[in-house]
């Protein structure tokens, strides 16, 4: 049963060296302990907080890692187990530990979509900027549609327009995977609506998915319908000519209205993650809602 104490029959409590099937390459009582897999990892990945407490009290290293540099904190975050994350951080777990695949605990929390774990890690100093472009937390959260995680990363200074060569921007990934909530959050927070992947814009990505809703959203935020990708094609040229999306593109191909231009300019003046200040402007409520895309 989870939480069972070793040594209840009077014997010595089970410790790290009582598991001969685990290959330990250094002293497991030290913070740089290495193993193929340990009971600490097992407890963390399954969210067994009582077992985790017992193992720590028996001398197991909080920062024990596998040959691929995976720590118990990585596993707890991947499983979205907030209670285990709290225990590990309380006992000194390395919040910015990096695996052989460049995954950090924060990246794993974004994979699982655990907003609570993301916030706790950020409060304990987790870096929002990735150690490598192979594992970017904000890109992973946007791709999977974890909008609350995206919001927290932005609030802690995450680069909303970080462009990775093989992925593009967070906005591009959200569009490519049709994650509407994340697309809206990124746009509302000031993401560049025309920055995508290479010469592909987010609107090109949306054209391929044939999403009218996302196309409208991007164009409302100023997406360039005339932008050409590496093949010299505009978004409208990526959809069937008679499709509803093609008709929508044709309707929006003309120059934007003065009202739309004013909205885009005012929002740009406020900058990233500052649009909430629009509510403080001395303007009619209807106009504020227009500026906020409400």
UniProtKB/Swiss-Prot annotation:
Gene3D superfamilies: Ankyrin repeat-containing domain, SOCS box. Residues 240-294 form the SOCS box domain. The modification N-acetylmethionine is found at residue 1. GO terms for molecular function: ubiquitin-like ligase-substrate adaptor activity. GO terms for cellular component: Cul5-RING ubiquitin ligase complex; cytosol; mitochondrion. SUPFAM superfamilies: Ankyrin repeat, SOCS box-like. Predominantly expressed in testis, kidney, and liver. Belongs to the ankyrin SOCS box (ASB) family. This is Ankyrin repeat and SOCS box protein 9. It comes from Homo sapiens.
